[in-house]
């Protein structure tokens, strides 16, 4: 499935006249920064500065597939969290819910496949939770299994990241745990999204609300025309206090 989707996203001999990036800019309080122009941005690839032709507000209408797995909260907290998240999206946005039937890596690929089939212009995968595993039990009986505990994503992380990038899908996540989730954080960073690891469930609702606001206040940067698209460039702004995240953007997926 992974290889087939990658092949579909990168047809042989395809040429792209211009390159577009989807960029998030946040202040030191985590709030989106509005009103930026091309002069505010610097884009470099392999140390060479690229020309920014235009900066426009991205469409605030998004299509989110929310995946639930191992989230350490009550049903009431989850319902409230979803309400805050959806309430910060525009009225035309779509949020579909997806559970994990097998492995989490498979669920993410299935979400990518679903978004690709719908040809949405602003596709998002949001993971609420994380992978899980059976903790070893100190009891020797074969009838006793350890409890489930939070765990990082396993599988071919680089290939999943490449698939998300090929389809210009942002990956976000929120997990309530003290377990390191380096692979999930890496996956989000590669796409221009972000994976939040929070220590307490009482911060879940506010974190989800911030993600919703972020999705509705992003930029599309158009770069100078090129006969081919190279490695993902580095995007920065003049103010060092601002946080910048960037990923690929395409009008079709």
Feature names for model-found ranges:
Residues 12-253:
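Scaffold/interface architecture of coatomer-like assemblies
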């Amino acid at each position: 499935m992974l290889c087939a989707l990658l092949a579909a996203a990168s047809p042989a001999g395809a040429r792209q006249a211009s390159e577009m990036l989807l960029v998030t800019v946040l202040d030191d309080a985590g709030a989106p920064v509005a009103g930026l122009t091309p002069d505010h941005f610097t884009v470099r690839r392999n140390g060479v500065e690229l020309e920014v032709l235009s900066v426009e507000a991205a469409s605030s209408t998004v299509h989110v597939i929310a995946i639930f797995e191992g989230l350490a909260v009550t049903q009431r907290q989850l319902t409230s969290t979803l309400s805050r998240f959806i309430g910060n999206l525009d009225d035309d946005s779509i949020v579909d819910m997806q559970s994990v039937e097998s492995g989490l890596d498979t669920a993410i690929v299935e979400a990518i496949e679903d978004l690709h089939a719908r040809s949405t212009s602003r596709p998002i995968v949001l993971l609420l939770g994380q992978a899980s595993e059976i903790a070893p039990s100190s009891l020797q009986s074969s009838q006793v299994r350890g409890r489930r505990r939070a765990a990082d994503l396993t599988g071919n992380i680089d290939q999943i990241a490449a698939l998300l990038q090929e389809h210009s899908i942002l990956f976000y996540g929120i997990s309530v745990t003290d377990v390191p989730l380096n692979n999930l954080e890496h996956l989000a960073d590669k796409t221009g999204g972000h994976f939040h690891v929070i220590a307490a469930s009482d911060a879940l609702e506010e974190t989800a609300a911030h993600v919703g606001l972020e999705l509705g206040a992003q930029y599309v940067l158009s770069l100078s025309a090129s006969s081919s698209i190279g490695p993902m460039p580095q995007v920065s702004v003049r103010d060092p206090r601002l946080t910048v995240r960037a990923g690929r953007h395409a009008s079709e997926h």
